[in-house]
């Protein structure tokens, strides 16, 4: 296959645009934090939250404030059954752990759970038939 010069220029421009050299801000939270029934994967552009049988994607980067506090604002959970449920996570980074308030709001109301997630630990979804896996 031979590309004409205009096609080659267009393809090169597209590739350069897609290879955005994004540099996350200083202090950006990265890595995996996990615990019982939950896992957070912080990247420079997105945060993936995995819960039993569902999860959510939040926009990144996440930069905790001077106290280590951050908020992952309310977003719809993934999956047909969970799509009417909103997930919000309010966290505090303390050393290698995140102390998180996990807020779920749906047709039945709002519930809040407290979770402690540890850096470098994957979420433990054992015992559940619909255990989440990394994409």
Place the predicted regions along the sequence by residue.
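Tryptophan-anchored aromatic micro-motifs
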Residues: 21-39, 98-102, 124-135
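Short, cysteine-centered beta-strand-loop-beta hairpins and adjacent loop/turn segments enriched
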Residues: 54, 77-83, 107-111
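C-terminal motif of bacterial Sec signal peptides marking the signal peptidase cleavage site
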Residues: 15-17
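An anionic, turn-rich surface loop/hairpin at beta-sheet edges
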Residues: 71-93
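N-terminal glycine/threonine-rich, aromatic-flanked beta-hairpin/loop signature
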Residues: 35-78
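Bacterial N-terminal signal peptides that target proteins for export
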Residues: 1-8
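Surface-exposed, polar helix/loop patches in the mature regions of secreted/periplasmic/lumenal proteins
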Residues: 86-131
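Short, surface-exposed coil-to-beta transition loops
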Residues: 35, 56-59, 83-88, 112
